[in-house]
Amino acid sequence: MIIRSPESEVKIVVERDPIKTSFEKWANPGHFSKTLSKTDPETTTWIWNLHADAHDFDSHTEDLEEISRKVFSAHFGQLAIIFTWLSGMYFHGARFSNYEAWLADPTHIKPSAQVVWPIVGQEILNGDVGGGFRGIQITSGFFPIWRASGITSELQLYCTAIGALIFAALMLFAGWFHYHKAAPKLAWFQQVESMLNHHLAGLLGLGSLSWAGHQIHVSLPINQLLDAGVDPKEIPLPHEFILNRDLLNQLYPSFAQGLLPFFTLNWSEYSEILTFRGGLNPVTGGLWLTDTAHHHLAIAVLFLIAGHMYKTNWGIGHSLKEILEAHKGPFTGEGHKGLYEILTNSWHAQLALNLAMLGSLTIIVAHHMYSMPPYPYLAIDYSTQLSLFTHHMWIGGFIIVGAAAHAAIFLVRDYDSTTSYNNLLDRVLRHRDAIISHLNWVCIFLGFHSFGLYIHNDTMSALGRPQDMFSDTAIQLQPIFAQWLQNTHVTAPSFTAPAATASTSLTWGGGDIITVGNKVALLPIPLGTADFLVHHIHAFTIHVTVLILLKGVLFARSSRLIPDKANLGFRFPCDGPGRGGTCQVSAWDHVFLGLFWMYNAISVVIFHFSWKMQSDVWGNISKQGVVTHITGGNFAQSSITINGWLRDFLWAQASQVIQSYGSALSAYGLFFLGAHFVWAFSLMFLFSGRGYWQELIESIVWAHNKLKVAPAIQPRALSIVQGRAVGVAHYLLGGIVTTWAFFLARIIAVE
């Protein structure tokens, strides 16, 4: 018998009126920082430090409780911003869009929710999107989401927009209330079991359940009527379906039985509403809404159970600390011992894990949005499909770099080696040389071999020797594992889900083509030598990004070059004067360099996606059933050389953005030009030293003094770290906007 000490009960503890609400502080810039508030802004460096440290709560105080409250309060501010943004989207849909026209004819009318005012000729940007409506074509995917939600009028969008604003105000109030009036104590933030239970059961469980309920009671009947061609104005309003059961009974007879089949385990009665079909609805080209309702109900059940698994005031359930400390293998020393203390005392450590998972999940979302398009008519809106993929890939890349940044900050600021003796984290840190040198070898191998295959092909192509190239028609390098995986997904459902009519995604294969309004929604995606080559470029760029970021994390505290690196902090330019060759070694500099390789990696991914889809998936179908792809299937033969990527993708597809002037797409031409300028501007910060600018500034200040117009705040050149931060920000912004303009001008013109 195991006798255990009685565990302390979880108490909800808050501190009343901890900090007075004061607007006077706002009039005192830098009030949050000891160093900034003591000095007046004598130089421009003070202003830069103000911006750098405003949200670095660690630099304001060392009190973890106060830091936790600030983070918690800031989360409500973030939610207020999100609700305000959503409100704006819905308001645009209500006030400036052709949503009702699109709803009536989604295959011929393009979505638009922005109309440019005629001031000095800008109305040229309002293109003809069909149905006599002139506006800017939007590519955010809101129209398909609204249709899937069961929104049938612009009045409903208005109401939702107002509701979102009310929620934004509530969030702002909550942020103020939980910092100034009733601030949680540190123990509340550290009670992980309660937090897991509430987040799993509340946010994910009840959130999924309420969405499943909405889908069943509102979305399904409205979408069924829309699919049948009923005029949206004739369809009952959402609340009528909820209040009047007879309306649902007419569409789904099993509804009349209520919850009886549920409690008698006769669940098959619900097979009209909750299905397991697989594939896509041939009318809309989206997932079957009955499948997605079933999915959300199942997810809700899982998370509601998960939200009751952790031990709080009742003596049953899991203890996170016990789970972690029991997690030991024969070769892993103390295993996960000490990680509980790390994750309950370092929010950077917890944030690093959350960002790594969220970033990966965001990239998974990007890949599912096109392969399993969840909303009606999304699959035939090629510009939206391209935008959603590109957006989620960029966001995922940034979030993963953020994970490495906060992992390094944790090691520099929060890591205590005495509590992590011989656990997995300690063992990883002690094996860092082996990890990084092996990863470096992998990067060299992948780089030379992946790029080498292209160089070989370019050379053979230039010499007129196509028979010696790696291609589907010469020396084949077929992606046999990927093809096996595709085939497995096509054949498996007949054994694992006999009731399903199709596999999870049409992209796996099987021969089915879904077309909507003479446009291809989705078809099996063939993989060949060209995909094998570019996938190894993906492997290379991802591994180099990981190498840079992981090296920054594992060497954040110390290295052979700088054994006391932890004392220098997260970001520093060099190890002081007199030690040459110690610049650009801070953890921050690794994040800086990692961002460039993340940009490389994601760029190749979105280029690959854009060309592959235009070549092998997207296109029109004739009455005879012949599919004509946008670029005529040229990916397999053109993308196997560097020259092919430059000539047949970048140059050939840039013609639309370059020739956009004088058309409704001209804004993209201007963005393309301007973003190139922003990108080039970044090089000025990245390729020149601080001293150059300081000399120039002093010369300019001399001229101002001569004219007696010298400023009171003395101008200073940016520090090395500030210059690099400004440089990478403009590099990424310029590059991403250039790509965005290039993609959208192209795809809107040809789809």
Curated annotation (Swiss-Prot):
Binding site for [4Fe-4S] cluster: 574, 583
Main localisation: plastid
Keyword set, alphabetical order: 4Fe-4S, Chlorophyll, Chloroplast, Chromophore, Electron transport, Iron, Iron-sulfur, Magnesium, Membrane, Metal-binding, Oxidoreductase, Photosynthesis, Photosystem I, Plastid, Thylakoid, Transmembrane, Transmembrane helix, Transport
GO cellular component: chloroplast thylakoid membrane; photosystem I
Binding site for chlorophyll a': 676
HAMAP family: PSI_PsaA (MF_00458)
Protein family membership: Belongs to the PsaA/PsaB family.
Name of the featured protein: Photosystem I P700 chlorophyll a apoprotein A1
